């Protein structure tokens, strides 16, 4: 079957109402509380899209802050920083150019590709196809629907056997983190492709099941392709507010809305009106609750920062098995680096990246899943959320090593 080809520029014309031409992404060095106050002042006077950390309230001394500024505010922001002697560098000088550079060719096939970013419709068709093509290893089920009525699919990967221990992996919590769903697709492909070729994969799939949720926030993901590439929240409506969406990784009942989250519907860190208020988070949580007897590990895949995190993020307390979790991610990070030399940092969420309540990894850990981790994939900020397709293969290859390392440890340390 011949694949239809379309110009990337045409696709991009439909991908966003905001063209981002002239927009910039900055990295600011925060030395002390005076700099923290200046960043918060800037956020109060200009429309700042924080990339890392998630909001002005999470800025702290002796860190760096990455944020995205609209073209009309660039001059004012740079003048403000210079007048206050705040050091900054421009990570992306024109966001529009970076958007176009995500795609590694001027033409793209309409079919599915593991080394391209795929639209939701393409991913959905792939889900059906991969289950049809691999009936001995893959089954698909619908665990719920999104706010806009799209089916949420989970793929169960493993050799059929009753009551097998399982590992749950989800991708695409935040809509603009396109590399995340790309990894879930890659994981499924490699699992079925290497089952009869690699003894370690065969052992994993014979002894464990893997539940893979390729895209959690489907509505938001679709919106990044059709309207606004920088969207991150869900697309639900709120009574009494014109602002849409909830930050899904602030919507779980784990220190809900206590820190690193907002009760304002217009905030990018809005925690929602209640825990699990979002159809997407409720469906995910219900599935895990219904399978708690078998799920032994939980991995949620995000970007960016090159980090492996474990609980807690909503509190500075350490988990009971802190030493075990730290040793495990240390080994996984070392394994990941063997392929392309990519360096990951690791540790508890609150101290390693920033405090944030309502996360799915903290929630799953508190449900009794003692191997619960968040991956923050490539890169460390040069491309940020706009990682080029040319890096998909390497990112997924190295992440696969880390995930298999953790999975094998879980297989050997069942509880």
UniProtKB/Swiss-Prot annotation:
Its EC number is 3.4.17.2. Substrate binds at residues 174-177, 232, 249-250, 303-304, 354. Residues 1-13 form the signal peptide. Residues 116-410 form the Peptidase M14 domain. Binds 1 zinc ion per subunit. Keywords: Carboxypeptidase, Cytoplasmic vesicle, Disulfide bond, Hydrolase, Metal-binding, Metalloprotease, Protease, Secreted, Signal, Zinc, Zymogen. One of its GO terms (cellular component) is cytoplasmic vesicle. It catalyses: Preferential release of a C-terminal lysine or arginine amino acid. It is found in: Secreted; Zymogen granule lumen. It is an enzyme of class 3 (hydrolase). This is Carboxypeptidase B. It comes from Rattus norvegicus. The gene is Cpb1.
């Amino acid at each position: 079957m011949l694949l239809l080809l379309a110009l990337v520029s045409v696709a991009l014309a439909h991908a966003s109402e905001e063209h981002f031409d002239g927009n910039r992404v900055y990295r600011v060095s925060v030395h002390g509380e005076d700099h923290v106050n200046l960043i918060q002042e800037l956020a109060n006077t200009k429309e700042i899209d924080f990339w890392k950390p998630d909001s002005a309230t999470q800025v702290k001394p002796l860190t760096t802050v990455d944020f995205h500024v609209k073209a009309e505010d660039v001059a004012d922001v740079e003048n403000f920083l210079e007048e206050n002697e705040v050091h900054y560098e421009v990570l992306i000088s024109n966001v529009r150019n970076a958007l176009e550079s995500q795609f590694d060719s001027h033409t793209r096939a309409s079919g599915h590709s593991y080394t391209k970013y795929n639209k939701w419709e393409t991913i959905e068709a792939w889900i059906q196809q991969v289950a049809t093509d691999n009936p001995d290893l893959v089954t698909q089920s619908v665990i719920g629907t999104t706010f806009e009525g799209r089916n949420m699919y989970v793929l169960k990967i493993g050799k059929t056997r009753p009551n097998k221990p399982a590992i749950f992996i989800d991708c695409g919590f935040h809509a603009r983190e396109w590399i995340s769903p790309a990894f879930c697709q890659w994981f499924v492909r490699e699992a079925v492709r290497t089952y009869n070729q690699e003894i370690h994969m065969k052992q994993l799939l014979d002894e464990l099941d893997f539940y893979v949720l390729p895209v959690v926030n489907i509505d938001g993901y679709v919106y990044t392709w059709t309207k606004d590439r920088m969207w991150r929240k869900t697309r639900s409506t709120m009574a009494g507010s014109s602002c849409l969406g909830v930050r899904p990784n602030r919507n779980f009942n784990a220190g809900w809305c206590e820190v690193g989250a907002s009760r304002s519907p217009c905030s990018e860190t809005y925690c929602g009106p209640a825990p699990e208020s979002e159809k997407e988070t409720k469906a995910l949580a219900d599935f895990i609750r219904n399978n708690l007897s078998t799920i032994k590990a939980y991995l949620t895949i995000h970007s960016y920062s090159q980090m492996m995190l474990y609980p807690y993020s909503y509190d500075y307390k350490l988990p009971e098995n802190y030493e075990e979790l730290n040793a495990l991610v240390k080994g996984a990070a070392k394994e990941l680096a063997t392929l392309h030399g990519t360096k990951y940092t690791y540790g508890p969420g609150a101290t390693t990246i920033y405090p944030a309540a309502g996360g799915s990894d903290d929630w799953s850990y508190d449900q009794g899943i003692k191997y619960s981790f968040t991956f923050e994939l490539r890169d460390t900020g040069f491309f940020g959320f706009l990682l080029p397709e040319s890096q998909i293969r390497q990112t997924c290859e190295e992440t696969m090593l880390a995930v298999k390392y953790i999975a094998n440890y879980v297989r050997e340390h069942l509880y």
